[in-house]
Amino acid sequence: MTCLALAVADDMLYGVLAGNSADNSAPQREIGYMTPRIFPVPAFAIAVGLSLSGTLRAELAELDRAIAAHRMGTLTVLTEPGQEVQVEQLQHEFWFGAAISSGPFGWQSNSSDTAKYKEVFLENFNAAVTENALKWHAMERHQGRVDYSIVDAILAWTAKNDIPLRGHNIFWGVPQFVPGWQKSLDDDTLRDTVKGRAITVARKYKGRFVEYDLNNEMMHANYYEDRLGPGITRQMADWVREGDPEAVLYLNDYDILTGNRLDNFVTHARGLLEQGVPIGGLGVQGHLHGDSFDPEALEHSLETLAGLGLPIRITEFNFPGQRSRYYRDKKLTLRDGEEESKAKAIVDYYRICFAQPAVKGILMWGFWEGANWIPASSLYRRDWTPTPAAHAYRRLVYRTWWTDWKGKSDDQGRCEVRAFYGRYRVTTEGQSEVVDLSSDAGAISVSFRQ
């Protein structure tokens, strides 16, 4: 008889939303034992948000089925019969990430908030993206004077803490973000300058960034194409690959998940692929909604994008979003009821994205009011106290979607645990092994038999 179990933490989200802050002890990258409940079928629906409209129960059940099918695999442990087995999740495979502000790694590195910023990041996120440090206009404000220091500092810190980092961005052709000194260059000099930037960045950081946004928001404006012709995007990619042949290049654009520019983006991506541009993934920003978001538009957009056959990252997520009153007036704060609505909406947004197998990660565009372009969208207030959204997020990621199982192997010395894809510590009878349960493999076996 096989010991088959689905381990789900015995914690309900709505205790948190009602004011219970017990989730501060939720596990992070290294965790202790947490008593699980054992369900014969997926039971995520009872533990997460309720803001989705329509036939709620059916919608939640469908999302849960998709999550169980696409985000979980089987971890088999082989021991002597009847031995105690513990399976502890250490890290998710899926990217639950955030943007890293330049300040704590540059001019604010000695600030009293810097240590707290890094600590809270590591407690909540397993992936990162440079918010501004890699942007050309930030690195080279004056021609020929390139400042690599902040990028270097961020890369050193993320590498030390085993945080995969995406590079945002190599180019940004929206005119207001093109370095002013470039606009007086003649076309030939501009082309040589673009080539130099691509090769230099890729060569200097070869193998250190997991992926790059090649040319940010091309669909909305493309100064370099306007100046240098439609073939420049392919050339940019080729030059980056000259510096780092393994570089993974993403598109990154906005107003797609709202549905407003979805068709345009699909056409844009297909056109670049037809030109031979080596697109490695689709970056879609997640902050063009307002005080609410349309779950049906989000689901439809993700399903449509999945049809392109490329991995998807939700690269810049804020809630409330850029079309909210909180973006227009940065001093506005959420009231109690609005805080709870925000928490529920974030849970729903993440659940929809997590249920779509083509989505490989979500990265918040700021998590602390002290370094967030939409302060009201932060998980943590200026004084570092957690918002209801922080409690809800941690409960979702580190309890509802977290596998921590303890039991005994059967009379054949076998135990199968359905577990979320990620890294695990498996322990039995004083022996321990760390293994990766990957979505590519779908299953892994760990043997402690002599």
Regions found by a protein language model. Give the residues of each.
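Beta-strand-rich domain onsets/edges
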Residues: 56-107, 136-139, 184, 228-231, ...
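Acidic (Asp/Glu)-rich catalytic clusters
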Residues: 116-125, 152-164, 202-206, 240-243, ...
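Bacterial N-terminal signal peptides that target proteins for export
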Residues: 33-43
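Bacterial N-terminal signal peptides
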Residues: 42-51
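Hydrophobic faces of well-ordered beta-strands that scaffold small-molecule active sites
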Residues: 96-98, 126-130, 165-168, 210, ...
